[in-house]
Amino acid sequence: MKQIDVFEYLPQIMRELKKGILVNTKNGDKTNSMTIAWGQVGIEWRKLFFTTYIRHGRFTHEQIENTKEFTVSVPIERTPEIAKAIAYIGSRSGKDINKLADCNLTLVDGIEVNSPAIKEIPLTLECKVIYSQEQEIDKIPAELKEQFYPQNVD
């Protein structure tokens, strides 16, 4: 892995985020990935940030709460195999299965975090949690709740 200037890749990160990218975690010997399609890159407190929202009920949330770190994998080329893997990972919990192994994805050690990168999706953002906040579902407009939270999941 090599370090990159995130701002050079920002258009690609934002384009791919709308289609779905991966958040990866590792806690002890348990790794997990989750598909996300909302997030943002920005600057807070003079630090480069990647912000995403992960609900309490998700295994990924538990992993991040325990480790305070994660990686984000962004496809440079969205091949049919990568698209299929991202869809599969987004449709199952990793609590009892190894979604990455099921998709034949190869884990690569992070440089500054213990959470893995994915060899087949080499554009990786390494992230450490420095701030978290509860999302107030009741403040989300009704039309967005209906569209993005149809199951009324906490």
Model-identified regions with their sequence ranges:
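Active-site-proximal mixed secondary-structure blocks
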Residues: M1-I36, Q40-D154
